[in-house]
């Protein structure tokens, strides 16, 4: 849906005339649009452990737990970390099939709300975006090494400031420290085709991703000094 028009007809001072008014909505004007999906519809999908889902609007995002500590133990430094999310083909025989989310934002779970509230752009440290590859039927993030390093260094800095506490203490205080969300988005571009804003995808899209409780592969290239 690109545009919705609302026509309002009313009488003014008992004269039967036609008046026109506009209800303006923009980022600067408070909007009260609300999309809601019944919980009883989403719950079985959320509880499905064989895969994960992406549904828009007001549907389901995918949460990913990154093996930060295990990856940092691979070497002295991570040069690259590539992660791919493959989607299942829709084999259902429906009269109308939903579209596939075309742009997918990866953002730290703890920063997701602030990302949209502050109209932030991806920084390739705590947030990334990619587009759907229809040839290979997947979403690919070519290098999230800076995200892995950032999460690890943030935790290590906390330990340095609180040497008396443990990993369990940190994870209890910051349970989402190693988690990211995959969020379908749409982009706004300027006249030079630069992205100037990310918005929640409000089109009718749905897809299933390979994963669920099973681990997916992250391809890591690391380096270490000979000792």
Residue ranges with predicted function:
Residues 1-227:
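Secreted, disulfide-rich extracellular signaling modules
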